[in-house]
Amino acid sequence: MSAGGPQPGGNVIGLSVQSTDLASKRVEILREVISDLRRLAILTNVGNSYAVLETGAAQAAAHMLDLDVVALEIRRAEDIAPAFEALKGRAEALYVVNDPLINTSRIRINTFALVARLPTMHGLREPVEAGGLMSYGPNLSDLYRRAAEFVDKILRGANPGDIPVEQPTKFDLVINLTTAKALGLDVPPTLLARADEVIE
């Protein structure tokens, strides 16, 4: 196991995508799309300790923008429908915390969000392909390429304990214009110009 950092030790190496630093950027982008945003719901799996950390970072970012936060807490897939039922009329956008349970339920979550007229912000591209509005997060293709470089170093004799665990360096903004139109949202041209991918 690796302790992480520049000299992690142990036998596990790799890239960390668990960066809570991105939460503030995601909240800022949501605010850019919805300029009069006042109430932000945050969907999180409270059974995942990392998801709880990201939730805290997203809440702090929302409070910095004077947004009210509504917590949508789930522990299993069966909790999703009741969570959205309880949310009715209480928020104007939805921050979706990155989590395996949430990611595997992305189609259901996006469907509920669309019915509730809630623009969504995700941490990965895949939920946006599945009908979410936007994502801002690590470029997975770049991570896979860098992971292959780690493998190459080890095959050439490098000690895994000497290879640092690295953070992502390339991030993508993905916007689903079909979803934006379904929500009646006009995405600012300046944001579209910054997008790495626009799904139409």
Regions found by a protein language model. Name each.
Residues M1-E200:
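Short hydrophobic alpha-helices and adjacent helix-cap/hinge residues
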